[in-house]
Regions:
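Interdomain boundary/hinge elements
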Residues: 28-31, 142-154, 188-199, 236-250, ...
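Conserved Switch II/interswitch segment of TRAFAC-class P-loop GTPases
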Residues: 61, 66-72, 80-104, 108-130
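Canonical P-loop GTPase G-domain recognition
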Residues: 113, 123-186
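Conserved nucleotide-binding/hydrolysis modules and their immediate coupling elements
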Residues: 197-302, 312-314
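A short, contiguous, amphipathic alpha-helix enriched in charged residues
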Residues: 309-332
Length: 408
C-alpha cells in the first residue's frame, strides 16, 4: 500500500483486517494495529515494514504495510520486490504528495499493477474530481504504461470502513476493494515443482529462536527441516549451507507454524544465524542468487557513550559500556541500515540513514532503561586515497511548465 504520511494507510489495513474476520468477537481492537511499536503509535508513522494476510472468499491476500518516510526508504524498495501489485492511497483533500511519487515511481518501474484508492472522501474539504486529475497527471509524468494508466479507481473512507466504485455511491463495507484486488491483481507466477528460490526481504529477531528471515518464495517449495544453500547476488563467493528449523506463515496479526509452503507465499523461517537481507535461500542443487536493491549507505553519525556526567546513574538501569555494546549489537541484528563501530572502551560511533532514524533508536533505548550520552550528529564524508571527496549532486526537478521560471 503506497501512501504519503497520514493519508490513512495503516487505518485502511486495520479495516481490512476487521472485515476479514480475523478478530474474535470479544477481542479488544486497537486503532492502527499495524503500527505495533509505542513510538510508531505516538508519532503516527510506520517505521518498519510489516506483513499480514487476510482471506477473502477463499483467496489469500498478503498485505505489506511500508513506511512512507525517506529515512526508512531502504525498507520500501525491498518490499516492492515481494508484491504483485500496489494500492495507491491518496487523500481526497491533499492529493498526491512527494513521498507518494517516490514509491510509486519504483512500483511502476517494476511493472506492478496499480489500484487507485481515494481515501477520506467524507472530509469537508475533499476535492475528488481535482485529485483524480492530479493522479492521472502523476501517472503520465512517471511514464506509466497504458494498462497502469487505466487503473481501476475506488473511493473510500478508511475510518468508516467503506468503499465504493463511484464518488457519490454510498459505501457499505470494503467488499468493492477486496473484489478489485482479487480480480485485477495477478496471482504470483512460480512453479512449485521447480528447485527452491527465495529472496530474504526483511529480518526479525527473537530471543528464543534468533534471527528470522522473511521473504517471498519465487519458485519451488520450502519445507521444515529442509537443507538449503544461502547465496548473495553482490558477493558471488559467499555461499553457506543451512537448515530450516521452523517455518511460519503470516495469518492476520500473527505468525502460525506450518510444515511447508510453495511459490508465491510470504513466509518467515528460523534456524540460520547469518541470514540477512538480500541473501537468496536456494535448493542446494541449484544455487541461483536473485538480484536485489543494495541498501543505501548511512549519511550521518553520532557517538553514543557511557554517561560520565555528575548526574550519572540516576535515571537508567543499564549504564555500563557492556550494556550499551550488547544493546547496539542486538539492534544490528534487525536493522540493516545501521552501522556501529567501537571508539575506545566506552564509546560507539553509530551511523544511520538520517536524524529520524537515529532519534528513534535513542528514544527506544531510553525507554528500555538505558542511560547514555550522545554527541551532536555530523555528516559522513567519503575519503579516497586519503583525500576527502566533495559530494557532487545531480538534481533533476520535475515541475509543471508554469513554475519553471520560479524554480530556475
Amino acid at each position: 500500500i503506497i501512501a504519503h504520511v497520514d493519508h490513512g494507510k495503516t487505518t485502511l489495513v486495520d479495516e481490512m483486517l476487521k472485515q476479514s474476520c480475523i478478530y474474535r468477537e470479544n477481542q479488544t481492537v486497537v486503532d492502527r494495529v499495524m503500527d505495533s511499536g509505542d513510538l510508531e503509535r505516538e508519532r503516527g508513522i510506520t517505521i518498519l515494514a510489516k506483513n499480514t494476510a487476510v482471506h477473502y472468499k477463499g483467496t489469500k491476500i498478503n498485505i505489506v504495510d511500508t513506511p512512507g518516510h525517506a529515512d526508512f526508504g531502504g525498507e520500501v524498495e525491498r518490499i516492492l520486490k515481494m508484491v504483485n501489485g500496489v494500492i495507491l492511497l491518496v487523500d481526497a483533500a491533499e492529493g498526491p504528495m512527494p513521498q507518494t511519487r517516490f514509491v510509486l515511481q519504483k512500483a511502476l518501474e517494476l511493472g506492478h499493477k496499480v489500484i487507485v484508492v481515494i481515501n477520506k472522501i467524507d472530509r469537508l474539504d475533499a476535492r475528488i474530481e481535482e485529485v483524480m486529475d492530479e493522479i492521472l497527471e502523476l501517472l503520465l509524468d512517471l511514464n506509466a504504461t497504458e494498462e497502469q494508466f487505466d487503473s481501476p479507481t475506488l473511493f473510500c473512507s478508511a475510518r468508516q470502513g467503506v468503499a465504493s466504485y463511484g464518488p457519490t455511491e454510498p459505501g457499505v463495507n470494503l467488499d468493492p476493494l477486496f473484489k478489485t484486488i482479487v480480480d485485477y491483481i495477478p496471482a504470483p507466477t512460480g512453479d512449485p515443482e521447480a528447485p527452491l528460490q527465495m529472496l530474504v526481504s526483511s529480518i526479525d529477531y527473537n530471543d528464543y529462536v534468533g534471527r528470522i528471515g522473511i521473504g517471498r518464495i519465487e519458485r519451488g517449495t520450502i519445507r521444515q527441516n529442509q537443507e538449503v544453500s544461502i547465496c548473495d547476488y553482490h558477493d558471488p563467493e559467499h555461499s553457506a549451507k543451512g537448515k530450516v528449523v521452523a517455518l511460519y506463515e503470516f495469518d492476520g496479526l500473527g505468525k502460525k507454524p506450518i510444515t511447508e509452503a510453495s511459490a508465491g507465499e510470504i513466509v518467515a523461517f528460523s534456524g540460520m544465524a547469518d541470514i540477512t537481507i538480500g541473501r537468496t535461500v536456494c535448493a542446494p542443487e541449484l544455487p541461483e542468487p536473485l538480484p536485489f536493491v543494495k541498501i543505501s549507505d548511512p549519511t550521518i553519525e553520532m557517538t553514543f557513550s557511557v554517561n560520565d556526567s555528575p548526574f550519572a546513574g540516576r535515571e537508567g538501569k543499564y549504564v555500563t559500556s557492556r550494556n550499551l555494546r550488547d544493546r547496539l549489537n542486538r539492534e544490528l541484528l534487525k536493522d540493516v541500515s545501521l552501522h556501529v563501530t567501537e571508539q575506545g572502551t566506552d564509546a560507539f560511533n553509530v551511523a544511520g540513514r538520517g536524524e529520524m532514524h537515529l532519534s528513534i533508536l535513542i528514544e527506544t533505548m531510553r525507554r528500555e532503561g538505558y542511560e547514555l550520552q550522545v554527541s551532536p550528529p555530523h555528516v559522513l564524508t567519503h575519503e579516497e586515497n586519503g583525500k576527502v571527496m566533495e559530494p557532487m549532486e545531480r538534481v533533476v526537478i520535475d515541475v509543471p511548465e508554469i513554475y519553471q521560471g520560479n524554480v530556475m
